[in-house]
């Protein structure tokens, strides 16, 4: 390895370790405290096939820092869905605060492309969005897309927070994010302060079957004055 490559590697490592330290020392930010459900499975999945899967480390997610005053906005807020007659459960379960992974704690939507949408009641600045699709079994959900908007129909404006639909099979544009394995800590998406009243999450089946599931969605932020 030549000198330039060594210097670049050192700079990257320094940034990796110093960024969390800087966040901890920033008086305007605090660690997001989450109540996580009990893990339902242990170990690394071996039978999942995906051409766009992120590297599986098996390590827990590190701390995530948000502006001081950030709070949970989504608890018991109204939920709409592309499938208002779910196969199992009710869409209101998406924001009921219960993140357990067993039977009876998730809503099951029909096959193919589906979405759920949380109405926060007013425009908010968003600092973290978490989703639990189904974590009692290791699986990958396809075409996960997270969007934020002030338009309930998502036809005008809005912000795309996450998109791992690498081949545009959902028709909302190809994304550059990676697919991931569902685990009990859920998936945290960083909206980077995006503003909106509505949060919509898309999926398109999973590696076990063509159905779509949601245990819980949590949205953290602050109302816009």
Cite the ranges covered by each PLM segment.
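Short linear interaction motifs
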Residues: 54-64
């Amino acid at each position: 390895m030549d000198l330039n490559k060594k210097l670049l590697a050192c700079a990257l490592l320094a940034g990796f370790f110093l960024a969390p330290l800087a966040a901890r020392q920033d008086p305007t930010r605090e660690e997001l405290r989450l109540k996580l459900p009990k893990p339902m499975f242990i170990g690394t999945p071996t039978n999942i096939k995906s051409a766009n899967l992120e590297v599986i480390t098996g390590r827990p997610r590190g701390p995530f820092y948000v502006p001081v005053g950030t709070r949970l906005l989504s608890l018991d807020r109204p939920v709409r869905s592309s499938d208002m007659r779910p196969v199992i459960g009710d869409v209101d379960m998406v924001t009921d605060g219960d993140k357990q992974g067993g039977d009876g704690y998730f809503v099951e939507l029909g096959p193919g492309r589906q979405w759920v949408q949380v109405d926060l009641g007013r425009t908010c600045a968003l600092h973290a969005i978490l989703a639990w699709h189904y974590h009692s079994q290791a699986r990958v959900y396809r075409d996960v897309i997270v969007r934020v908007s002030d338009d309930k129909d998502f036809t005008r404006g809005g912000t795309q927070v996450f998109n791992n639909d690498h081949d545009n099979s959902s028709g909302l544009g190809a994304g550059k994010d990676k697919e991931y394995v569902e685990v009990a800590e859920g998936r945290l998406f960083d909206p980077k302060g995006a503003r909106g009243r509505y949060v919509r999450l898309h999926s398109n089946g999973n590696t076990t079957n063509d159905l779509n599931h949601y245990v819980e969605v949590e949205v953290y932020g602050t109302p816009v004055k």
